[in-house]
């Protein structure tokens, strides 16, 4: 009867297993002492397997009953049960041989177990150990054991169970002194007495007696072999471990040589030689290739071949095994002594419950043999167990010579080396893509076939890989088993934890070969490299647009399908992207974890925080290759590049208008639908965004929340405040290389450079006029449309430009905040102050490229250049006169309307132009700021000074095209040209006489005034004389 069947019969007697015709019931037929029942129940409770039951309900019930039989809560107190659990754990942590010795004496408490351990330690400190060996043929045994350097195989794990059941080994044991092979064997009686008195002898005897196998195995099934190259790579510690493992296997296989009992009959007290010989022949065939045994060999072992692979080792283990492995072909049939038959039977009966334990080491086909002491995991090969143990110890013996990375298995190292060599031997036949591992190829091929064999039971989603399904299931369960020891953050995947830990270490192992930028993640490097290569492998089937990342493609496709899969549970708002939902949810939770140390501003996302820090550092890593403009964010760069390529991907479905930015389309669509429009309660004006409404409302309530700490000035908008602060810091980081002028913004520098290059990329579609900045074009278009969006609250006057409104409002408030340091004059506009300062410095930065003439103002240069080009774009609708500037047109139109908006406070005189009022006021104040360098004569206006200086220089720039006559002043040329044209636009109302000049008209009008005055005077004198009469 095999040990497995014996154990099964014992369990069946106990009532804890079912027979073929039995139904399950709790039996009470177990025979034996209470101690045996307790130990057996303990073993059955620990070693019950799920496949031994019919289902989970039965497994749970059996475990409960076995635990009750083991702990006996009806008879023991809580303290006693706790002591049993502690005793079990104490025995489990003892070394194997000591645990066997302690369990041999059945300690009832922890104190008894401690006493037994201390007793054994004292005995082990004595002289050399004498090992009792069960003798079958003393001559053959003497040949093997007495060989120089003979060592016995290690005890099988789990042998302490048999030692518990067989406390008294057979008496026919012969003690051999391992240190003295020539020592004579004592008599059996003396040997038995020695074993009873010396616990060491009992312990060592049990190591041999209790190594009972469950099933016979061949040595090849548990051996681990290395090639000569692999063996050369092993270190001393690894080779020592290999010797220990192989010796352990040798001990395990050697124990299988003992004769097995038949299933249906007990072992006879005197087995015949023929029975033993037949049994021995079958056993020897199974042991073919094993190490030399104490018993008989039928075949020559292959241990010598294995030893030859180890080379010339100097280790003592090598010498020992080589000597033991000199096998002899002993054909003698050995039989145990007849007087031992009864003891063999008792031993077989006592080993009934030992087979359950030996399952943990050597099992039947399909079972796992080797158990890890750390996590109790089982393995069917000891090489797998060795590799598994390295996970607990952290040992990584296989090192990469390129990067120093360590691996537990050599196969993992070989795969890793392909990363350095670039070798990808596995190629896809569909698309030609190559892979370094076959598993990667198999997973990739499922993309072509569409196969998703791993399905989620919760939502039905399919996955190409099993690992993907496991990770997905953690979303449903919320499980995040991987925790960071630094900050306590948890992750659903170990890879995410490794990547996160690089943040703490500052490690960036992936570096770009072109720009040397480093990244934490390899996928980030791959995506970054597509910026250099311009690769966009993911294409939309609807519109043909390509993307660098598959996530961008998925998000883009949702625009076509109008899918918004991510919904906020708080407010019901839906989003295309999950990250947008996460950012939105922080609005409800008010979770803002990223704080700026410089300004104290807090952000809910790390990306926004990084973008904000670039405002302080002025870092702009994203540069346009077309115009050189730099941006703080890549999204701004993408939007900017659409200006160059003319791309406007966002089209309104209502009116067909296209936009560069999606947010511009969203704001525009609100005007069609009326959805989410923000209306001002004071004036009814609507806005597309709440931010614009808030800024607008501050105009009504006068709120200016942004205050300058330097001068105390307040502002409605933050951007206006930031621009103002640069006046105090005089921070102008952007300098023009042509003229040296500095600017606070890079955009201002780009616009300024167009003055030097003459570039005007923004053209008006109505009149074809081009501008250097888009803002100027927008302002120009208002002239054609007649739009004047800026209205004065005091007088209701409207303006095209906001700065014009601000300047106009200063007329009402009489605010002039810009003061000249040289003469103390104040101005409403900063631009006027800058232009005024050029009077003191004599600077004329705007020069004509045709004649070289310089101008203080850019507008004067533009007007001057029209003289050369003959361009006159502004026509008067009344008299069809064409003028070179809109300002001149406005001044000219006042002649027809008679409008004179500028009035002198001193004398009440009105003027059509502000400059004429300023010159007139100098007559009252006596101010003459313009002085001639030659004669020191002063003038009230600069025009008079310029005309006077031409007397000294003799310059007469204005020539007549008809008679070639030249003049110092333009007005003189104008008057002269009327002689050729006979134009007399000035007509006297009294005499209806026409004049070519207004001055002549004024003289004629004075003549009529004098004549009228004389007539009245004469009339009054006549009336007086009549009254006297």
From Swiss-Prot:
Family annotation (Pfam families): KRAB (PF01352), SCAN (PF02023), zf-C2H2 (PF00096)
UniProt-listed SUPFAM superfamilies: beta-beta-alpha zinc fingers (SSF57667), KRAB domain (Kruppel-associated box) (SSF109640), Retrovirus capsid dimerization domain-like (SSF47353)
Residue stretches making up the KRAB domain: 217-289
Keyword Transcription regulation: yes
Zinc finger regions, C2H2-type: 370-392, 398-420, 426-448, 454-476, 482-504, 510-532, 538-560, 566-588, 594-616, 622-644, 650-672, 678-700, 706-728, 734-756, 762-784, 790-812, 818-840, 846-868, 874-896, 902-924, 930-952, 958-980
InterPro entries for this protein: C2H2-ZF_domain, KRAB, KRAB_dom_sf, SCAN_dom, SCAN_sf, Znf_C2H2_sf, Znf_C2H2_type
A Gene Ontology BP annotation from the UniProt entry: regulation of transcription by RNA polymerase II
Protein name, UniProt field: Zinc finger protein 197
Localization of this protein: Nucleus
PANTHER family: FINGER PUTATIVE TRANSCRIPTION FACTOR FAMILY-RELATED, ZINC FINGER PROTEIN 502
GO cellular component, one term: nucleus
GO molecular function annotations of the record: DNA binding; zinc ion binding
Family: Belongs to the krueppel C2H2-type zinc-finger protein family.
Function of the protein: May be involved in transcriptional regulation.
Keywords: DNA-binding, Metal-binding, Nucleus, Repeat, Transcription, Transcription regulation, Zinc, Zinc-finger
Region (Disordered): 262-290
Domain SCAN box: 42-124
């Amino acid at each position: 009867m095999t040990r497995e069947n014996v154990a099964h019969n014992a369990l069946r007697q106990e009532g804890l297993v079912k027979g073929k015709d039995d139904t399950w019931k709790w039996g009470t037929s177990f025979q034996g002492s209470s101690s045996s029942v307790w130990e057996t129940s303990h073993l059955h409770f620990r070693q019950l397997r799920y496949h031994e039951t019919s289902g989970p309900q039965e497994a749970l019930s059996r475990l409960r009953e076995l635990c009750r039989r083991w702990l006996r809560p009806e008879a023991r107190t809580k303290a006693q049960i706790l002591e049993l659990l502690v005793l079990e754990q104490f025995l489990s942590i003892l070394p194997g041989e000591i645990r066997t010795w302690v369990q041999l004496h059945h300690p009832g408490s922890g104190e008894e177990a401690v006493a037994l351990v201390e007793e054994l330690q004292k005995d082990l400190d004595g002289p050399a150990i004498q090992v009792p060996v069960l003798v079958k043929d003393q001559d053959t045994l003497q040949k093997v054991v007495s060989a120089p350097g003979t060592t016995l195989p290690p005890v099988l794990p789990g042998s302490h169970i048999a030692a518990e059941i067989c406390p008294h080994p057979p008496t026919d044991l012969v003690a051999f002194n391992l240190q003295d092979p020539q020592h004579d064997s004592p008599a059996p009686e003396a040997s038995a007495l020695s074993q009873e008195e010396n616990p060491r002898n009992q312990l060592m005897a049990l190591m041999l007696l209790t190594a009972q196998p469950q099933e016979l195995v061949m040595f090849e099934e548990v051996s681990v072999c290395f090639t000569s190259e692999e063996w050369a790579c092993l270190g001393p510690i690894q080779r020592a471990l290999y010797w220990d493992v192989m010796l352990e296997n040798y001990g395990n296989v050697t124990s299988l040589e003992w004769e097995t009992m038949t299933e249906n009959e007990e072992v006879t007290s005197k087995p015949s030689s023929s029975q033993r010989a037949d049994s021995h022949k079958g056993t020897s065939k199974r042991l073919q290739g094993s190490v030399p045994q104490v018993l008989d060999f039928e075949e020559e072992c292959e241990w010598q071949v294995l030893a030859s692979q180890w080379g010339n080792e100097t280790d003592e283990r090598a010498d020992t095994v080589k000597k033991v492995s000199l096998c002899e072909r002993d054909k003698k049939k050995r039989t145990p002594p007849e007087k031992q038959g009864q003891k063999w039977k008792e031993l077989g009966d006592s080993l009934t419950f030992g087979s359950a334990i030996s399952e943990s080491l050597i099992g039947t086909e399909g079972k796992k043999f080797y158990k890890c002491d750390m996590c109790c995991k089982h393995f069917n090969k000891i090489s797998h167990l060795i590799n598994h143990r390295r996970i607990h110890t952290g040992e990584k013996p296989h090192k990469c010579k390129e990067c120093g990375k360590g691996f537990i298995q050599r196969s993992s190292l070989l795969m890793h080396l392909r990363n350095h060599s670039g070798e990808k031997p596995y190629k896809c036949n569909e698309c030609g893509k190559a892979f370094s591992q076959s598993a990667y190829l198999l997973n990739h091929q499922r993309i072509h076939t569409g196969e998703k064999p791993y399905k989620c039971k919760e939502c039905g989603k399919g996955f190409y890989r099993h690992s993907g399904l496991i990770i997905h299931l953690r979303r449903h369960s919320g499980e995040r088993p991987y925790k960071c020891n630094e900050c306590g953050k948890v992750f659903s995947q170990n890879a995410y934890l490794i990547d996160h830990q690089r943040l703490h270490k500052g490690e960036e192992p992936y570096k770009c070969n072109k720009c040397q930028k480093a990244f934490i993640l390899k996928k980030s490097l791959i995506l970054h490299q597509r910026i250099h290569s311009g690769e966009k492998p993911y294409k939309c089937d609807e519109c043909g647009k390509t993307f660098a990342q598959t996530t961008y493609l998925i998000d883009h496709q949702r625009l076509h399908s109008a899918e918004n899969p991510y919904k906020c549970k708080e407010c019901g708002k839906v989003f295309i992207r999950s990250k947008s939902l996460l950012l939105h949810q922080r609005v409800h939770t008010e979770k803002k974890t990223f704080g700026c140390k410089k300004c104290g501003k807090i952000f809910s996302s790390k990306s926004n925080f990084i973008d904000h820090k670039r405002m302080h550092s002025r870092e702009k890593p994203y540069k346009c290759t077309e115009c050189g403009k730099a941006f703080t964010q890549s999204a701004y760069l993408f939007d900017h590049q659409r200006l160059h390529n003319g791309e406007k991907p966002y089209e309104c479905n209502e009116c067909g208008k296209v936009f560069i930015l999606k947010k511009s389309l969203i704001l525009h669509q609100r005007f069609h639908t009326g959805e989410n429009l923000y209306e001002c309660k004071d004036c009814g004006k609507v806005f597309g965004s709440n931010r614009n409404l808030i800024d607008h409302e501050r105009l009504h309530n006068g709120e200016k929340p942004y205050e300058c700490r330097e001068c105390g000035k307040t502002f409605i908008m933050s951007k206006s405040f930031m621009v103002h602060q640069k006046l105090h810091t005089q921070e102008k980081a952007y300098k023009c290389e042509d003229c040296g002028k500095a600017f606070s913004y890079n955009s201002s520098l780009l616009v300024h450079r167009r003055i030097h290059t003459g570039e005007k990329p923004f053209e008006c579609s109505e009149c074809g006029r081009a501008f250097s900045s888009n803002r100027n074009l927008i302002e120009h278009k208002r002239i054609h449309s007649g739009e004047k969006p800026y209205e004065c609250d005091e007088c209701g006057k409207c303006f095209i430009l906001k700065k014009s409104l601000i300047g106009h409002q200063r007329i009402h408030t009489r605010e002039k905040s810009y003061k000249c340091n040289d003469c103390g004059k104040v101005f409403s506009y900063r631009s006027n102050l800058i232009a005024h300062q050029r009077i003191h410095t004599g600077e004329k930065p705007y020069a004509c490229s045709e004649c070289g003439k310089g101008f203080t103002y850019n507008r004067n240069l533009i007007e001057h250049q029209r003289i050369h080009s003959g361009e006159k774009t502004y026509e008067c609708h009344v008299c069809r006169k064409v003028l070179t500037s809109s300002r001149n047109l406005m001044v000219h139109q006042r002649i027809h309307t008679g409008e004179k908006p500028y009035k002198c406070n001193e004398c009440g005189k009105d003027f059509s132009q502000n400059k004429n009022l300023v010159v007139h006021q100098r007559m009252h104040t006596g101010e003459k700021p313009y002085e001639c360098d030659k004669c020191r004569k002063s003038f009230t206006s600069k025009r008079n000074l310029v005309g006077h200086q031409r007397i000294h220089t003799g310059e007469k720039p204005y020539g007549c095209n008809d008679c070639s006559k030249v003049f110092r002043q333009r007005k003189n040329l104008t008057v002269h040209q009327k002689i050729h044209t006979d134009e007399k636009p000035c007509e006297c109302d009294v005499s209806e006489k026409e004049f070519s000049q207004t001055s002549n008209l004024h003289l004629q009008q004075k003549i009529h005034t004098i004549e009228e005055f004389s007539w009245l005077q004469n009339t009054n004198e006549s009336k007086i004389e009549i009254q006297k009469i």
